[in-house]
């Protein structure tokens, strides 16, 4: 896929009002000669989306409902902004696959991001993948579509982007063929890394969302606190880099300075370091194979002074064990894991369940739901739906 270098690249930002979307727009705004926002999408923060449209003047904006569209159109008209408003999943897929688009930032959180992200892949776009659930739910189908349609897939998660930067350019030949022994996926350990296990019963959503190093949305903050985020990233790494789960090792690194490492058979270990700011991987993927200024401050090694590492505690973080088991089982297991986790995290944020019950609920759903092949997108969503129903049934059974 080529683009006219005499004009700025047109970027669709799926999930523009979220943390990744806002960081993407920050990087884009630093390089108006290179990039322009073509389409911005939002879900519940319509006023924020309106402000972004007025500032960035995209051709399109997408919202989930007619009610939201009416509200956004009124605001745009009052501001003299000509952005056209589209609705629903059809609108998302339209702006993800439009002929004018050069790159798509896929940053819608959760299963809702799968169809529009896949639409971008099937249109052969350069896809900046921040929605890890797309690969967790439908890894085999997704990667096959990438190959068949000639899409360019660039990881945005700081860990996967770090691995990408530490890999040789021809890693698609196979990890053993390029001398990679294992992938070392770093994890901060989140806010509860040293909390006594018995005290986890009483932690609040506010405590779970107070990450020591990163600024993130509420859902991913809870996933980070439970280490389910790292489990989902393990599954994602297996698909992105064609690795078996045993080749991906999780390392707790509290400072979040080393974003991941690649261990080679000759004894070399390559690591990518940087301040914990998502604008670095976003800028890396936007400009790849070139480099651009991201607005992130240079890393001050003297201020850091030390880097610590430890093995993850699976008694404290059972979600990591469940995710590895799902990765090893393959087929529908990761999709079921993801769906059960989405329901459990929502229930925790609504104070309907306690923090340790997130893992307990997911484990019961995984035990109840048989592992089956997922030959189509319909099969993926059917597995997702069954897992959500089992999760809601668990909540009802436990009086939640």
UniProtKB/Swiss-Prot annotation:
Task: Please tell me whether the keyword Manganese is annotated for this protein.
Answer: yes
Cofactor(s) listed: Mg(2+); Mn(2+)
Q: Which residues bind Mn(2+)?
A: 157, 159, 233
This entry's Enzyme Commission designation comes to 1.1.1.267
**Record bears the keyword NADP:** yes
> Catalytic activity, per the record?
2-C-methyl-D-erythritol 4-phosphate + NADP(+) = 1-deoxy-D-xylulose 5-phosphate + NADPH + H(+)
What SUPFAM superfamilies would the database entry show? Answer: 1-deoxy-D-xylulose-5-phosphate reductoisomerase, C-terminal domain, Glyceraldehyde-3-phosphate dehydrogenase-like, C-terminal domain, NAD(P)-binding Rossmann-fold domains
Q: Which Gene3D superfamilies match?
A: 1.10.1740.10, NAD(P)-binding Rossmann-like Domain
Sites where the protein binds 1-deoxy-D-xylulose 5-phosphate: 132, 158-159, 188, 211, 224, 229-230, 233
Top-level division of the source organism's lineage: Bacteria
Q: Which UniProt keywords apply?
A: Isoprene biosynthesis, Manganese, Metal-binding, NADP, Oxidoreductase
| Binding sites annotated in the UniProt record for NADPH | 17-20, 131, 133, 217
What is a biological process (GO) this protein takes part in? isopentenyl diphosphate biosynthetic process, methylerythritol 4-phosphate pathway involved in terpenoid biosynthetic process
Involved pathway(s):
Isoprenoid biosynthesis; isopentenyl diphosphate biosynthesis via DXP pathway; isopentenyl diphosphate from 1-deoxy-D-xylulose 5-phosphate: step 1/6
Q: Which GO terms describe its molecular function?
A: 1-deoxy-D-xylulose-5-phosphate reductoisomerase activity; manganese ion binding; NADPH binding
Family of this protein: Belongs to the DXR family.
Q: Which NCBIfam families match?
A: Dxr, PRK05447.1-1, PRK12464.1
Function of the protein: Catalyzes the NADPH-dependent rearrangement and reduction of 1-deoxy-D-xylulose-5-phosphate (DXP) to 2-C-methyl-D-erythritol 4-phosphate (MEP).
This chain belongs to the protein called 1-deoxy-D-xylulose 5-phosphate reductoisomerase
**Which species expresses this protein natively?**
Pseudomonas putida (strain ATCC 700007 / DSM 6899 / JCM 31910 / BCRC 17059 / LMG 24140 / F1)
Highest classification ranks of the organism: Bacteria, Pseudomonadati, Pseudomonadota, Gammaproteobacteria, Pseudomonadales
Q: Report the gene name.
A: dxr
């Amino acid at each position: 896929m080529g683009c006219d270098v005499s004009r700025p690249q047109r970027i669709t930002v799926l999930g523009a009002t979220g943390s990744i979307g806002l960081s993407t727009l920050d990087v884009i705004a630093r390089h108006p000669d290179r990039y322009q926002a073509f389409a911005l999408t939002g879900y519940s923060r319509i006023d924020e989306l309106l402000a972004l449209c007025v500032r960035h003047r995209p051709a399109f904006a997408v919202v989930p409902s007619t009610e939201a569209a009416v509200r956004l159109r009124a605001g745009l008209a009052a501001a003299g902004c000509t952005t056209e408003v589209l609705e629903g999943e059809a609108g998302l897929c339209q702006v993800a696959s439009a002929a004018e688009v050069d790159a798509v930032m896929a940053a819608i959180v959760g299963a809702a991001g799968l169809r529009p992200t896949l639409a971008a892949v099937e249109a052969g776009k350069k896809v900046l993948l921040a929605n890890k659930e797309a690969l967790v739910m439908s890894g085999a189908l997704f990667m096959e579509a990438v190959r068949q349609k000639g899409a360019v897939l660039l990881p945005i998660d700081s860990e996967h982007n770090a691995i990408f930067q530490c890999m040789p350019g021809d890693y698609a030949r196979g990890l053993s063929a390029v001398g990679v022994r294992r992938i070392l996926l770093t994890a901060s350990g989140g806010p509860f890394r040293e909390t006594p296990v018995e005290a986890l019963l009483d932690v609040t959503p506010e405590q779970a969302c107070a990450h020591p190093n990163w600024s993130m949305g509420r859902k991913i903050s809870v996933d980070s606190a439970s280490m389910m985020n790292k489990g989902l990233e393990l599954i994602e790494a297996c698909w992105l880099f064609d690795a078996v789960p045993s080749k991906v090792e999780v390392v707790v690194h509290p400072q979040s300075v080393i974003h991941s490492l690649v261990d080679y058979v000759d004894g070399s270990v390559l690591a990518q370091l940087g301040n914990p700011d998502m604008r670095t991987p976003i800028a890396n993927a936007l400009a790849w194979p070139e480099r651009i200024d991201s607005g992130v401050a240079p890393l001050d090694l003297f201020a850091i002074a030390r880097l610590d590492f430890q093995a993850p505690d699976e008694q404290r973080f059972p979600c990591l064990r469940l995710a590895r088991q799902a990765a090893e089982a393959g087929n529908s297991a990761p999709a079921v894991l993801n769906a059960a986790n989405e329901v459990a995290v929502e229930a925790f944020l609504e104070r309907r369940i306690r923090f340790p019950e997130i893992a307990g609920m997911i484990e019961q759903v995984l035990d109840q739901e048989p592992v089956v092949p997922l030959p189509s997108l319909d099969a993926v969503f059917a597995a997702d739906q069954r897992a959500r129903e089992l999760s809601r049934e668990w909540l009802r059974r436990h009086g939640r």
